[in-house]
Amino acid sequence: MKTIELFKFMISAKSQTPDDGGLLDFIQNYLDDFEAIRVDVEGVKNLFLYKKFSQGDHLCFAGHVDVVPAGDGWDSDPYIATERDGYIYGRGAQDMKSGVAAFVQAIKDTKHFNGTLSLLLTSDEEGEGTYGTIEVLNYLRDKSMLPDFAVVAEPTCEMVFGDAIKVGRRGSINGYITLRGKQGHAAYPEKSINPINLIAPKLANMAGVDLDNGDEFFSPSKFVITDIRAGMQVTNVTPNELKMMFNVRNTTLTSQKEIREFVEKNLEDLDYDLRLTQGSYPFKTDTKTKLVKNIDASIEQISGIKPKHSTAGGTSDARHMAPLGIDVIEFGVINDTIHAINERTTKDEVKKLYEVFKHLIDTWK
């Protein structure tokens, strides 16, 4: 089986999160000369394969086989790899069955490596992610088996293949504000305390405000209001309280402390509660490490392009690796149709991705 054939086969597996569509069993059998560890938790399937070729570094390729729901409106069956107009269409074509197929085949074709090669796959990345990659990493940590370096094959390229790798990600902090007032009749506003009136003049100083200036790798942390609601959906009663939710994709320059201080500064004269939760923490891999230098060289060798180092976009499972001391980057195909109707990629991109990963493995030292 070659890369494109493997890629098409993977698309045909209906692996809507957290279902793996049988892919983890298939891949385990496909790489039957690798040692296998299964860490299946609460219905989530996780697979770790490893093989020590020689003394040296431990390099891991990681990803997920689950996909988001396909939805309606596709021009072809989202679970049949369909070639049309120079593209291969199917759910997961970009995110991220192309990446998984590329590194699985690259590993399959490897006879020699300067160290240990491994593969980490989960069926729970697009969903909650609670019992996915993090469970495998915790197991490996307890067994002193964590990799030194990791490549997550998420789709990272923006305009052309090879133009970007992720060397980090912003964190994500969610905020929940409850602002208290005093309910009353709309005809007698002087007898009530309307929380809508209280918050209205404050919003201009909060919505969309940059909380830091960012740096050469991170765009500024921005205060993004995502929901405001109050009242009982009637016209003659003013609300007793208002609830507001917000999100901050934070850099390493902004933490919960700075966000709390920002809210307190703007709402200091109001009666409110604030709750913050950390969805993920920001991280950045040193761009001078062996991993970044080697992947840059492999991408440039195959694509002729020197990739930029980016931290843009949402979160990925790489966020679980960095805090454990693993040098991690992300690299994959163009990401312009991820989670979209008629998701697609090209044969050329998938083949080149395989070649990049194979070159990285073959030249690692």
Curated annotation (Swiss-Prot):
The active-site annotation reads 66, 125 (proton acceptor)
Name the reaction it catalyses: N-succinyl-(2S,6S)-2,6-diaminopimelate + H2O = (2S,6S)-2,6-diaminopimelate + succinate
Q: Which cofactor does it need?
A: Zn(2+); Co(2+)
Its keywords, alphabetically, are:
Amino-acid biosynthesis, Cobalt, Diaminopimelate biosynthesis, Hydrolase, Lysine biosynthesis, Metal-binding, Zinc
Entry-linked InterPro entries: ArgE/DapE_CS (IPR001261), Bact_exopeptidase_dim_dom (IPR036264), DapE_proteobac (IPR005941), Peptidase_M20 (IPR002933), Peptidase_M20_dimer (IPR011650), Peptidase_M20A (IPR050072)
Q: Which residues bind Zn(2+) 1?
A: 64, 95, 154
Instruction: Report the co-factor binding details.
Output: Binds 2 Zn(2+) or Co(2+) ions per subunit.
Q: For this entry, list what GO says about its biological process.
A: diaminopimelate biosynthetic process; L-arginine biosynthetic process; lysine biosynthetic process via diaminopimelate
Q: In which pathway does it act?
A: Amino-acid biosynthesis; L-lysine biosynthesis via DAP pathway; LL-2,6-diaminopimelate from (S)-tetrahydrodipicolinate (succinylase route): step 3/3
Question: What task does this protein carry out?
Answer: Catalyzes the hydrolysis of N-succinyl-L,L-diaminopimelic acid (SDAP), forming succinate and LL-2,6-diaminopimelate (DAP), an intermediate involved in the bacterial biosynthesis of lysine and meso-diaminopimelic acid, an essential component of bacterial cell walls.
Record note on quaternary structure: Homodimer.
Its protein name is: Succinyl-diaminopimelate desuccinylase
| Species, as recorded | Sulfurimonas denitrificans (strain ATCC 33889 / DSM 1251)
